[in-house]
């Protein structure tokens, strides 16, 4: 600790310096009021704690000095010291912000506990600051998270013979005291009818967390809304257009930021699913009758994430959604779930996703989606997923 002391007893000053110096504390003891005030008001301001007598030269003057010191060192705890007969002065100092006080017994036994007392005050102040910062962090994260979640659709529509459900879930971190904080993130999904026959399904994921990721995904959401009226029936052209526009947005690509996107169009008459991936996971199909489950492509079928380079070309992939089957599109937070202490021993992964879907084969899609998130969370052994997760699950009836 860096300790500044204003003391009025030279003999005690030497002993205090000896006791506090045992733990290699950086201690400056001032034997005169003038020296103490010079150090406190004009000298170095980076003290961990200040200890001062509240009796000298007299209690009123000491209080005035204390107020000056408090004004100069708002973040530094000040501890007072007084003899037993002077304790009735303590209340005034405590009311004005003094953190604690020490009774100076005539035998000097107080010096044996001096370091412990000062250290406990410093630790208490640091803990309070950490709690304050943690609470401010929670408030800021919550406000950004609510802003981000405001663009998530709540009422989804599906064409005849289809059902659709979706879910977004933020990642979590733990801050002071182990309390979980739900992070503001950059995940996003949308489901809407392009026309009477074509249903759009998309999931997006902006890199990072916090305000930048949130604003990146809101920028993409705005662009999607602006150009969806063009009614692109070519998913690759749509994704390329979004990419070119995002590359013009500094909020997205500053500091290497980017967005992954899976954009698909389902034709409800032909049951054809046309999709384009910009760095997003490959869609999964689960045929309920046979329990066959598979990805619709490989990692090579995904293009470059959005916002990295303009003029990029993207590929169109076309698949038929079989009767009595389910189609899953998702962001990588679902698969990249792992226990914090077992990062190198695997993740929930595509295998975990497929096993969860198969286990929910006979359940309604809402239950299957709930089970998917539950199983992914369970894999983390309580630590929570470290990335946001967006999932859209589509069910085709016979």
Task: Show which residues each predicted segment covers.
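… and, occasionally, acidic/histidine-rich disordered N-termini of signaling adaptors
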Residues: 132-326, 382-398
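Conserved acidic residues
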Residues: 48-49, 99, 325, 332
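Active-site-proximal, acidic helix/loop segment immediately C-terminal to a metal-coordinating Asp/Glu
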Residues: 211-231, 321-384
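Two-component/phosphorelay signaling modules centered on CheY-like receiver
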Residues: 7-34
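Short acidic, S/G/P-rich loop/turn micro-motifs used as interaction or catalytic elements
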Residues: 9-12, 54-60, 85, 107-109, ...
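Acidic, metal-coordinating helix/loop segments flanking the phosphotransfer/catalytic sites
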Residues: 29-49, 53, 57-59
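CheY-like receiver
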Residues: 60-129
């Amino acid at each position: 600790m860096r300790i500044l002391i204003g003391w009025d007893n030279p003999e005690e000053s030497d002993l205090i310096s000896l006791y506090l110096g045992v733990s290699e504390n950086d201690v400056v003891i001032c034997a005169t009021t003038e020296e103490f005030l010079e150090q406190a008001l004009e000298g170095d301001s980076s003290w961990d704690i200040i200890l001062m007598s509240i009796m000298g030269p007299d209690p009123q003057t000491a209080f005035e000095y204390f107020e000056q010191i408090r004004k100069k060192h708002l973040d530094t705890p000040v501890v007072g010291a007084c003899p037993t007969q002077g304790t009735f002065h303590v209340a005034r100092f405590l009311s004005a912000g003094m953190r604690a006080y020490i009774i100076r017994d005539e035998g000097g036994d107080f010096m044996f506990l001096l370091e412990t007392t000062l250290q406990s005050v410093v630790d208490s102040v640091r803990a309070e600051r950490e709690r304050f910062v943690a609470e401010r962090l929670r408030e800021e994260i919550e406000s950004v998270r609510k802003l981000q979640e405001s663009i998530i659709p709540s009422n989804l529509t599906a064409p005849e013979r289809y059902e659709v459900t979706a879910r977004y879930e933020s990642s979590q971190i733990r801050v002071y005291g182990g309390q979980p904080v739900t992070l503001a993130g950059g995940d996003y999904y949308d489901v809407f009818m392009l026309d009477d026959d074509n249903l759009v399904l998309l999931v997006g994921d902006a890199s990072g967390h916090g305000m930048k990721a949130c604003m990146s995904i809101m920028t993409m959401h705005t662009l999607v809304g602006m150009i969806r009226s063009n009614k692109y029936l070519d998913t690759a052209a749509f994704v390329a257009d979004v990419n070119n526009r995002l590359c013009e947005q500094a909020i997205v690509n500053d500091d290497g930021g980017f967005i992954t996107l899976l954009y698909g169009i389902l034709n409800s008459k032909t049951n054809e699913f046309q999709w384009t991936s910009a760095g997003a996971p490959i869609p999964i199909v689960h045929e309920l009758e046979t329990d066959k489950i598979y990805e619709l492509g490989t990692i090579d079928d995904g293009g470059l994430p959005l916002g990295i380079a303009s003029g990029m070309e993207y590929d169109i992939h076309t698949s038929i959604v079989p009767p009595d089957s389910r189609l899953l599109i998702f962001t990588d937070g679902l698969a990249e779930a792992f226990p914090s202490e077992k990062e190198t021993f695997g993740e929930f992964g595509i295998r975990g996703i497929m096993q969860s879907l198969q286990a929910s084969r006979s359940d309604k899609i809402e239950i299957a989606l709930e089970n998917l998130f539950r199983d992914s969370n369970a894999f983390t052994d309580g630590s929570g997923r470290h990335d946001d997760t967006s999932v859209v699950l589509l069910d085709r009836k016979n």
